[in-house]
């Protein structure tokens, strides 16, 4: 079954909003910060093993006085002001997240980088058909280089999901509720089905975007 694009009127409140660059930047920074593990750790002079004994007597050697071989300026000593495990996540209001997603989608829509298909029509998983569908939509460059695509699928479209997931990191498959500012900006083109577009519009129209 051939994949057919459809003409739809995209809601202006979501796809024709003013692009707010500072807001997008703030939300993307918060999203990337939340993705950090924050497990970095170094030992201070009190945590490094050893160093309890004074290396040499206080006076009479002609050398600078030293109290421990684990001081930061000693080889094998602790680290002064080094990193410790921490949580980098930032609380971002839901309204800001929603507004940033809308700004990013409006930017893509303004550059004609959003495509809507009627339905994918995969009854069995087929990577070959997935590649053919992308080529039929004109989403491969002349040199056959794969553009970065975001394909928005429904949970029930399992065969379609299995077909596209083999195409590598340049094809990002997301659910409507997983659409986020960073992924929208990372991808060159976004492909909705009529069903997932309706779900996305319902989600963003009601302002229920999740916190980052």
Task: Name each model-derived stretch.
Residues 1-37, 83-212:
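Extended polybasic, low-complexity segments that bind anionic RNA or targeting/receptor surfaces
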Residues 22-59:
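A short, flexible low-complexity segment enriched in Lys/Arg and Gly/Pro that occurs
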């Amino acid at each position: 079954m051939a994949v057919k694009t459809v003409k739809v009127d995209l809601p202006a409140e979501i796809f024709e909003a003013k692009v707010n660059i500072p807001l997008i930047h703030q939300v993307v920074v918060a999203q990337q910060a939340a993705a950090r593990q924050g497990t970095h750790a170094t030992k201070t002079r009190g945590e490094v093993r050893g160093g309890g004994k004074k290396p040499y007597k206080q006076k009479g050697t002609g050398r600078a006085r030293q109290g421990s071989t684990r001081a930061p300026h000693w080889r094998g000593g602790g680290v002064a002001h080094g990193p410790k495990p921490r949580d980098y996540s930032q609380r971002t209001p839901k309204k800001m997240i929603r507004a940033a997603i809308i700004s990013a989608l409006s930017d893509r829509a303004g550059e004609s980088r959003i495509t809507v298909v009627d339905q994918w029509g995969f009854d069995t998983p087929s990577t070959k058909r997935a590649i053919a569908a992308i080529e039929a939509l004109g989403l491969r460059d002349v040199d056959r280089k794969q553009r970065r695509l975001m394909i928005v699928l429904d949970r029930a479209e399992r065969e379609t999901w299995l077909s596209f997931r083999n195409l590598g990191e340049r094809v990002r498959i997301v659910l409507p509720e997983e659409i986020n500012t960073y992924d929208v900006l990372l991808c060159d083109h976004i492909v909705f089905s009529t069903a997932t577009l309706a779900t996305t519009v319902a989600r963003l129209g009601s302002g229920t975007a999740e916190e980052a």
